[in-house]
Amino acid sequence: MILDKIAASTKIRVENLKKEVSFSFVKSEASKLVNKSPFAFEKAVKDGELTFICEIKKASPSKGLISENFPYIDIAKDYEAAGAGAISVLTEPEFFLGSDQYLKDVKKTVSIPVLRKDFTIDPYQIYEAALIGADCVLLICALLDTDTLKEYIKIADGLGLSCLVEAHDENEVKSAIEAGSRIVGVNNRNLKTFEVDITNSIRLRELVPSDISFVSESGIRTAQDISALRRIGASAVLIGETLMRSGDTGAELAKLRGSA
């Protein structure tokens, strides 16, 4: 399963990072930071309107190379200008060809919150996310049990970081809620088969209490998809490949937002 391969690769990456910069140092430096906009990401998805979280990614395991030239700073500017409420930046280097530098540069470029889209399997990565300027970290229920989710949310809370807790099925949604998640994202992509079906969000929406922000992720391509998710009361949609492949990310976002 590809998720297991990514997690194994990430574990090696984090262990190598710890040899370069110790866990105690990263934790200490992150803890010294003064977060001037704590929990900015969750405020963005709670504003009462359907929030568009727009993704910047160069490649993916399922689709290969998505953007060869990859003018990520221009894309970030276009997203913000077209009305994005937040930006998701892939930082996983092996399978998504991501980089922490992309997030640092995007954060300097835009005024909207930025999600670090990576595969969090170690507390080190949460402190690291704070240091590179992220407003939110991704926690994937398929990789983390309920107790670990609780632990990671507590660490993020102490840093003023939001957590987007991603689930794919009923049990994972329940785990996310039990862990105290304030933002639950339902991934419409089955990470075992890579099949995409937005009815997964529609089916699982009723399990998420109204005081928890609900984000639909993956496979959102059309005005009809947006309308369907708006009808079920989604707080936000996370859209990546549809925008990245469009040729004009800003215009495509404006088109989708106009349908909301």
UniProtKB/Swiss-Prot annotation:
Coiled-coil ranges per UniProt: none
EC number: 4.1.1.48
Pathway: Amino-acid biosynthesis; L-tryptophan biosynthesis; L-tryptophan from chorismate: step 4/5
Record bears the keyword Endoplasmic reticulum: no
SUPFAM superfamilies: Ribulose-phoshate binding barrel (SSF51366)
UniProt entry tagged with the keyword Chloroplast: no
UniProt catalytic activity: 1-(2-carboxyphenylamino)-1-deoxy-D-ribulose 5-phosphate + H(+) = (1S,2R)-1-C-(indol-3-yl)glycerol 3-phosphate + CO2 + H2O
NCBIfam families in UniProt: PRK00278.2-4
Protein name (Swiss-Prot/TrEMBL): Indole-3-glycerol phosphate synthase
